[in-house]
């Protein structure tokens, strides 16, 4: 759908101007921040879905390629769900100025399952799974919820 849209320059400029991108690491994008900052920025513009999606893809590609270029990386892996978006990956490659080799889908899915399983184990043990040193949060904490089947109903 994004491929069929056009970039809205005013929306792109507004998204790229969000203060988060000027903060030094460590930092992490949280769902709440996306809902409050990104969605409200998008809603301020009267655009159709194709134009919004095309602009958001460009925004993501700009932000990711900026970080890649700032570190002068010679190689690496891009993982996570966004890697399955071939249009996003094309835009990142174009802005990065290098071809980004595809990552094996099994590796991506395994990594995601392993990480979220580990976060769940930490949650069950009531150990921090969100570290201040990684995310920039004000403190270490245990994030997320675990839901058990009805037979073993218990909410942690």
What are these regions (language model features)?
Residues 50, 76, 104-106:
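Membrane-interface transmembrane-helix boundary segments in multi-pass integral membrane proteins
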Residues 73-92:
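Glycine-rich phosphate-binding loops at beta-strand->alpha-helix junctions
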